[in-house]
């Protein structure tokens, strides 16, 4: 009997699995045709009711999980037509019975599971009903006003609802998205939420977005549980104010009151609300939505007090999201950037998929208090996309899936890891294959590699999209298994199952599927995405009744793409499912929508599980988590039953644990270090406050977690903290970083958008920071050394890192992410890339062929071009070492695809200059022997060898026509051995031609070209340069025509010195009119200590301010001035006759463009400008220091700030190139026992100001226009009166305020002498005039005709030409003579212009004679004859009133008559006087011959009478003096100055100081 029973039980045991394998679920089918893909399905919680919306018009309802359907009537429109609805959504809180239909017509709502629907009513602020079907505000009926609707319900007040609508409208003729918010107290009638405020611009409407503070019944924000927060902002417009206003009200919306008032001046941008935390993001710049932002958290038990949260990284508006897990805030920051600066062009050909995956993502998680954040460092590499999957039931588990690249559509390269301790530690997802069924390309059993399950989509387990579905420890996912080389094809992925909450995974299906779970994971339904995954065209689904251990196939008779797979019970407790799919035609047109209801209620013959079928499952293998051990009851895997507790939430049991280290977090004043230890965080303000006036303090380094339930708390020992290391409370924030290597190079990306900077060290490592150096991270290159970094000057978000192994690391998002491409074979030569100005994907790379050794004669450079961003390279030209795209070099190239290159011949070593328009399939040699070429300011300048050891310069402005740079003829005596192109501005090139090349005695002539860049004149003759060709020449940024140079005062002595022992004596000169006039710099009256200088400042020749220039700079990027801090300059120098060594220098400053200077510090300092000059920072140079000096009031006062605990040697003080940020980076080093250590200190001055400056075009508010012109110009410079916009308030910062009118021309002026400079072959002499150089001739005036074919005339040279910058009109015309000549070949046009019509001329002349004769006749008869004729003519006296005047005509005639008599009298007297003087002349001559000793009585009396009388009529003409001077100096083409120059005046003048060694008195001036 015993054995018989055993056989019976064995038979039954073998039979039961057969029953499960033979089971087929009940399947119901339904089809809908002509849906055009518009099908929406919705199920209610804890209910069998399902809704279906077809074609946006027809609504159906099912009460049996979708087996049968009934039509539901919906409200009609006002004209009794069906309304169209776009979205069918379930209420987020009341999922059991409330749903909504929304569309362009408004919103419908149901409260009875879809049986009946009511149209919601919307009212404006004046209680007028809003009709959303009215499209008049859009202007195009094809574009609907409502784009999206978001509906919120209050978790404890069902009738309180908020609806936020995204509405399409028009703004300035463009379609604009606008947010409007409505509230309801009864759930049916909604009124517009409005603060009553208006935008500054009435044409720019306001956005409003409102939200309940209490998001769920679990919310811990108790004091705000019945409150609503609204955010109001203007609809964005270019350069507008992007900040918001925050309001708070209750659920009844009685009134809106300001919220978070302490943040209102800090530009609130976004609000993030979760169950435990309320965060507000504020912008550092209200005018820049991409500016760095700060995060603020509502303090515990407060309603309106916020504390700032430090994240350790930069965050940006609209690129940040906040979620919550187990009371901890998770912040994801998506750094996705495209070139949007004004000087960039978006890449229109860029793949949209590449753009989506082109950024990078950071993720951070807070402690349980939401205060201290740490990075979720799940991988060394930067992620370009990231999915964090967490469970709402077991919250400690996190799955991270990220991608680094997406190469093409359909190619996926992703990685995954799992954490069971909230991101503290991460591990790979282990793969199990106990039966060895699957082949993988890596070793899944090894713990030493990264071979694991790479998760793409996750299902079940209460994770992400299935967050309400709970299956204890049972999770399904789509993904692949690999270590390095993914298959890249989505359809080659598999479906995997885990039964231990993600610790291990097993493949169950060899294709990707949609997966849904029921009966708490005991039923798993999977539908392949591809119907042909099983090699037949029909669709099928697979199901498992043993938690994924085995699957059975169920074949369907249709072929479709599965769009939705829904459970009947939203909590995963049910046993039926709905599968929805779409049948497509071959051309991807939607033909039919199908739905299947799959019912498993009869599985296992309807058996329900008993206690013996259940098992205990412990989360995290029974480890204590948050003070508890979690235990769930779940069905045994092979049990032949279903739990069948439909609509019942599964619960778990908790067992409390004793407190351990895992239940504690770092205290508020501490942060966790790399070793996991809590260390004092000296950057926190709270620690600074506690340490104030104390030597040391004792604090507990840890605090117990807010979410733990552990018992028996540990005794935390306090730690003593020395306050010496804590900086004193200050508005300057300091962040220190230490490196064991030395920075060899560093450079910011030139942009307003970010403060991103790249570093390269002496260990060939590369680092990046996106917050001005506060957080510096190493760029992962796979261990490859970085040899060089190139920045793209045309696309300021792009940079390229050259790897030693010939990899090129490219970034197009300011260093947030890098893509790796391989460089062409051959040796890297270190030549910079050549970029295309209009195509970010196109650049030229230079590699070396046959260069095993650089001394190999066969070693030569080769230029390669890429047009796909480096993905592939083509050989462009052999021997080319420098190329330029014409579209990058000149403004208006005359050819397309033009490229010019310098090519070196391998055999002769000669360099040639070649061009091509077909990527060098054909080429043209333009010059066969050159030294090199460069581009500057729209010109290309080519240095061509000329004769023996001489050069000639050729220029082009279109890339086709080249002209020789014609230098002044008096320089012909000098060999043109070296010249330096100093740049171009406003249509003129500045160039330095070296006239003395002796070592340490170099100097030369400063030249300036005409607009064409072909004809040069000398500005100064002895301008200093060094042996490297650098010149002491600097144009002041942001101001017109101001240049500083250093001249060699003893140039003649140096040239004539035979032993070459003379030292250069340098003096600084400044010009305010682009080089036309130069003067020494007037020194300040006293030094920084209030003492007078030891020289007389009235004598500028002996006492002027001399500055160290470009030739002495350690970093050529350190300029005197800044383009954003208008008028400000710093310089090192001294007051005296000559420039002294830099060791004796002081630091000087000007804020008016160089007119007046002051000494700010003794000794030499480095300087930087911040926030357009709002912040000025100095740091000691050439000696150890721990202190910076700063000024926030334009240099009026200075304060010292100690930024380091010990003195360091400062290498550099840097900030963003545009000097617009308020963060400064100090780079230095200190020496310790381990050697030299690099240290960086980021000084943040953003808290130094209480607010951001206010500005608008109509009201300057915190700004003013100032004139920075030299006083002697009477505000007219370059022919106009210009003013500059500058901040006038010291308590605010500028940021990116839209200062588009920062330079404004108020009026044009008449031309004066200051608007002209000397023409070719003319030179300025000591009296300020332009004189033809002896022995030379003016330029042939006809040459201008050959350069401009549109001209028909030319003028004889006058010795003057108009300064290119001048916009003057009228006034003194010096450039053209009065006699024009026709251009050769343009005689006909010339005559046409100046021809005279003889017939017309004769007619006009006759008409004028007749008029004149008639007038004389009328005056004679009416005036002279009527009053007695000519007889009385001699009796008339001015002022007599005895003439006949009977009417107005008589009075007019007599007035003319009186004036005529007066004129005749004066002319007659003048003739008499002239005759008298002539007579006297002859009489004096005769008297000399006659030897008379005294005058005759006739002469004496007659002369005295006439002199006394005629003095009343004849004045002294001062112009006669000028005329005499012009005649005496007729060869000089002299024009007198407009103003006299007073050399004794304290005011520096524009009068020139000549340094011509040949002049006897070089400093004479008129």
Curated annotation (Swiss-Prot):
Lineage: Eukaryota, Fungi, Dikarya, Ascomycota, Saccharomycotina
GO BP terms: Golgi to endosome transport; Golgi to vacuole transport; protein targeting to vacuole
Glycosylation sites: 796, 1308, 1397
Keywords: Glycoprotein, Golgi apparatus, Membrane, Protein transport, Receptor, Repeat, Signal, Transmembrane, Transmembrane helix, Transport
Topology, Cytoplasmic side: 1422-1566
Cell location: Golgi apparatus, trans-Golgi network membrane; Prevacuolar compartment membrane
UniProt xrefs under SMART domains: VPS10 (SM00602)
Membrane topology, Lumenal segments: 21-1400
Annotated stretches, region: Disordered: 1534-1566
Name used for this protein in its record: Vacuolar protein sorting/targeting protein 10
Record gene name: VPS10
Family: Belongs to the VPS10-related sortilin family.
Role description: Functions as a sorting receptor in the Golgi compartment required for the intracellular sorting and delivery of soluble vacuolar proteins, like carboxypeptidase Y (CPY) and proteinase A. Executes multiple rounds of sorting by cycling between the late Golgi and a prevacuolar endosome-like compartment.
GO cellular component, one term: membrane
Signal peptide limits: 1-20
TM region(s), chain numbering: 1401-1421
InterPro entries tied to this protein: Sortilin_C (IPR031777), Sortilin_N (IPR031778), VPS10 (IPR006581), VPS10-sortilin (IPR050310), WD40/YVTN_repeat-like_dom_sf (IPR015943)
Membrane topology, from the record: Single-pass type I membrane protein
Biological source species: Kluyveromyces lactis (strain ATCC 8585 / CBS 2359 / DSM 70799 / NBRC 1267 / NRRL Y-1140 / WM37) (Yeast)
């Amino acid at each position: 009997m015993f054995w018989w029973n055993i056989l019976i039980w064995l038979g039954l045991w073998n039979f039961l699995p057969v029953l499960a394998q033979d089971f087929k679920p009940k399947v119901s089918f339904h089809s809908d045709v002509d849906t055009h893909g518009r099908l929406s399905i919705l199920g209610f919680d804890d209910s069998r009711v399902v809704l279906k919306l077809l074609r946006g018009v027809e609504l159906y309802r099912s009460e049996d999980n979708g087996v049968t359907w009934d039509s539901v009537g919906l409200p009609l429109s006002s004209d009794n037509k069906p309304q169209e609805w776009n979205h069918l959504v379930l209420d987020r809180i009341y999922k059991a019975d409330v749903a909504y239909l929304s569309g362009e017509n408004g919103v419908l709502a149901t409260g009875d599971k879809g049986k009946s629907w009511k149209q919601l009513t919307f009212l404006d602020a004046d209680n007028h009903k809003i009709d959303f079907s009215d499209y008049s505000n859009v202007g195009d009926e094809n574009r609907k006003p409502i784009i999206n609707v978001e509906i919120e319900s209050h978790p404890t007040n069902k009738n309180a609802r908020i609806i936020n609508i995204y509405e399409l409208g028009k703004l300035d003729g463009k379609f604009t998205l606008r947010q409007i918010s409505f509230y309801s107290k009864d759930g049916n009638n909604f009124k517009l939420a409005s603060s009553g405020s208006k935008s500054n611009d009435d044409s720019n409407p306001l956005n409003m977005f409102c939200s309940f503070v209490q998001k769920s019944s679990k919310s811990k924000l108790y004091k705000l549980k019945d409150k609503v927060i609204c955010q109001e902002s203007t609809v964005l417009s270019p350069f507008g104010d992007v900040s918001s206003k925050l309001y708070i009200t209750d659920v009844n919306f009685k009134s809106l009151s300001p919220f978070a008032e302490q943040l209102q001046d800090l530009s609130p941008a976004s609000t993030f609300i979760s169950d435990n935390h309320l965060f507000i993001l504020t912008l550092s710049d209200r005018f820049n939505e991409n500016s760095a932002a700060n995060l603020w958290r509502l303090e515990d038990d407060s309603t309106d007090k916020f504390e700032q949260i430090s994240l350790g990284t930069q965050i940006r508006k609209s690129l940040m999201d906040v979620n919550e897990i187990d009371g901890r805030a998770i912040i994801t920051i998506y750094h996705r950037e495209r070139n949007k600066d004004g000087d960039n062009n978006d890449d229109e050909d860029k793949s949209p998929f590449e753009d989506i995956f082109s950024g990078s993502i950071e993720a951070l998680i807070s402690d349980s208090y939401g205060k201290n954040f740490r990075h979720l460092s799940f991988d060394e590499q930067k992620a370009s996309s990231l999915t964090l999957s967490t469970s709402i039931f077991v919250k400690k588990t996190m799955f991270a899936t990220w991608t680094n690249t997406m190469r093409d559509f359909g190619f996926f390269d992703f990685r995954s890891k799992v954490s069971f301790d909230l991101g503290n530690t991460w591990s790979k997802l282990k793969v199990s294959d106990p039966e060895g069924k699957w082949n993988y390309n890596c070793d899944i059993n090894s713990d030493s590699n990264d071979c694991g399950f790479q998760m793409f989509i996750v299902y079940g387990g209460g994770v992400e999209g299935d967050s309400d579905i709970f299956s204890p420890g049972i999770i399904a996912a789509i993904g692949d298994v690999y270590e390095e080389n993914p298959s890249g094809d989505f359809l080659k992925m598999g479906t995997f199952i885990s039964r231990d909450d993600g610790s291990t995974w097993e493949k169950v299906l060899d294709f990707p599927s949609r997966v849904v779970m029921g009966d708490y994971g005991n039923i798993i339904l999977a539908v392949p995405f591809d119907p042909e995954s099983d090699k037949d065209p029909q669709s099928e689904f697979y199901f498992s009744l043993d938690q994924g251990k085995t699957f059975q196939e169920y074949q369907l008779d249709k072929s479709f793409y599965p769009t939705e797979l829904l459970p009947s019970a939203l909590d995963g407790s049910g046993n039926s499912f709905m599968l929805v799919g779409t049948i497509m035609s071959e051309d991807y047109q939607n033909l039919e929508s199908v739905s299947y209801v799959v019912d498993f209620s009869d599985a296992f013959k309807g058996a329900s599980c008993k206690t013996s079928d259940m098992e205990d499952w412990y989360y995290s293998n029974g480890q204590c988590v948050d003070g508890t051990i979690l235990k769930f009851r779940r069905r045994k895997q092979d049990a032949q039953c279903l739990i069948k507790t439909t609509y019942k939430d599964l619960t778990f049991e908790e067992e409390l644990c004793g407190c351990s280290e895992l239940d504690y977090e770092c205290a508020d004043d501490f942060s966790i270090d790399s070793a996991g230890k809590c260390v004092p965080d000296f950057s926190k303000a709270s620690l600074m406050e506690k340490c104030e006036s104390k030597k040391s303090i004792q604090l507990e380094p840890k605090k117990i977690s807010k979410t733990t339930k552990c018992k028996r708390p540990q005794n935390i020992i306090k730690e003593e903290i020395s306050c010496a290391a804590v900086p004193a409370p200050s508005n300057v924030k300091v962040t220190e970083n230490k490196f064991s290597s030395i920075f060899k190079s560093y450079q910011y990306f030139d942009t307003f958008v970010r403060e991103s900077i790249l570093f390269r060290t002496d260990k060939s490592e590369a680092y990046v920071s996106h917050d001005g150096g506060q957080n510096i991270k190493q760029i992962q290159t796979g261990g490859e050394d970085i040899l060089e970094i190139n920045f793209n000057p045309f696309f300021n978000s792009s940079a390229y890192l050259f790897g030693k192994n010939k990899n090129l690391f490219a970034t197009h998002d300011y260093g947030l992410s890098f893509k790796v491409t391989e460089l062409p074979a051959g040796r890297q030569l270190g030549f910079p890339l050549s970029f295309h100005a209009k195509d970010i994907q196109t650049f030229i790379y230079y590699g070396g062929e046959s260069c095993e050794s650089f001394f190999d004669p066969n070693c030569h450079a080769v230029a390669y071009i890429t047009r796909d961003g480096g993905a592939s390279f083509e050989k462009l030209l052999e021997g080319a070492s420098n190329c330029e795209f014409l579209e990058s070099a000149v403004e208006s190239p005359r050819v397309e695809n033009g490229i010019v290159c310098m090519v070196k011949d391998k055999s002769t070593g000669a360099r040639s200059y070649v061009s091509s328009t077909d990527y060098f399939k054909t080429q043209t040699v333009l010059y066969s022997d050159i030294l090199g070429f460069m581009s500057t300011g729209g010109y290309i300048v080519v240095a061509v060898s000329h004769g023996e050891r001489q050069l000639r310069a050729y220029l082009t402005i279109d890339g086709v026509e080249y002209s020789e740079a014609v230098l002044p003829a008096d320089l012909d005596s000098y060999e043109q051995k070296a010249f330096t192109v100093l740049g171009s501005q406003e249509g003129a090139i500045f160039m330095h031609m070296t006239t003395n090349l002796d070592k340490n005695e170099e100097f030369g002539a400063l030249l300036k070209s005409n607009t064409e860049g072909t004809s040069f004149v000398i500005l100064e003759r002895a301008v200093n340069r060094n042996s490297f060709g650098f010149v002491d020449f600097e144009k002041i940024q942001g101001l017109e025509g101001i240049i500083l140079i250093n001249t060699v005062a003893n140039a003649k002595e140096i040239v004539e010195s035979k032993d070459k022992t003379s030292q250069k004596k340098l003096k600084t000169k400044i010009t305010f009119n682009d080089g036309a006039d130069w003067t020494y710099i007037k020194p300040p009256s006293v030094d920084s200590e209030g003492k007078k200088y030891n020289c007389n400042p009235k004598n500028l020749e002996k006492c002027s301010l001399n500055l160290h220039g470009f030739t002495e700079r350690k970093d050529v990027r350190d300029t005197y001035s800044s383009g954003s801090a208008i008028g400000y300059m710093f310089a090192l120098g001294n007051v005296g006759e000559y420039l002294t060594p830099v060791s004796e220098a002081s630091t000087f400053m000007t804020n008016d463009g160089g007119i007046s200077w002051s000494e700010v510090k003794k000794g030499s300092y480095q300087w930087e400008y911040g926030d357009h000059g709002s912040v000025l920072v100095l740091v000691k140079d050439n000696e150890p220091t721990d202190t910076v000096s700063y000024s926030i009031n334009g240099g009026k006062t200075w304060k010292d700030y100690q930024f380091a605990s010990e003195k360091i040697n400062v290498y550099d003080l840097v900030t963003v190139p545009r000097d617009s940020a308020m963060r400064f980076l100090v780079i230095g080093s200190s020496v310790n026992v381990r050697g030299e250590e690099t240290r960086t200190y980021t000084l943040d001055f953003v808290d130094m100001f209480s607010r951001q400056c206010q500005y608008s075009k109509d009201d300057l508010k915190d700004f003013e226009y100032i004139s920075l012109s030299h006083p002697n110009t009477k505000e007219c410079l370059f022919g106009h009166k210009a003013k500059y916009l500058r901040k006038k308030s010291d308590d605010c910062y500028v940021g990116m305020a839209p200062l588009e009118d920062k330079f404004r021309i108020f009026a044009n002026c008449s031309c004066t002498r200051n608007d002209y400079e000397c023409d070719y072959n003319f030179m300025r002499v000591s009296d300020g005039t332009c004189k033809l150089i002896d022995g030379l001739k003016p330029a042939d005036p006809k040459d201008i005709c050959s350069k401009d074919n549109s001209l028909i005339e030319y003028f004889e040279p006058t010795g003057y030409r108009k300064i290119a910058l001048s916009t003057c009109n009228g006034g003194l015309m010096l450039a053209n003579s009065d006699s024009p000549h026709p251009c050769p070949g343009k005689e006909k046009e010339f005559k046409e212009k100046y021809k005279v019509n003889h017939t017309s001329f004769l007619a006009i002349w006759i008409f004028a004679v007749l008029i004149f004769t008639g007038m004389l006749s009328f005056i004679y008869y009416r005036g002279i004859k009527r009053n007695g004729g000519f007889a009385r003519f001699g009796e008339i006296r001015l002022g007599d009133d005895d003439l006949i005047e009977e009417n107005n005509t008589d009075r007019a005639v007599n007035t003319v008559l009186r004036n005529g008599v007066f004129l005749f009298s004066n002319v007659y007297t003048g003739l008499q006087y002239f005759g008298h003087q002539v007579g006297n002349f002859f009489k004096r001559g005769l008297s000399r011959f006659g030897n008379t000793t005294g005058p005759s009585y006739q002469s004496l009396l007659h002369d005295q009478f006439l002199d006394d009388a005629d003095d009343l009529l004849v004045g002294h003409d001062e112009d006669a003096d000028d005329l005499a001077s012009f005649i005496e100096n007729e060869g000089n083409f002299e024009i007198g100055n407009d103003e006299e120059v007073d050399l004794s005046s304290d005011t520096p003048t524009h009068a020139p100081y000549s340094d011509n060694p040949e002049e006897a008195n070089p400093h004479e001036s008129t």
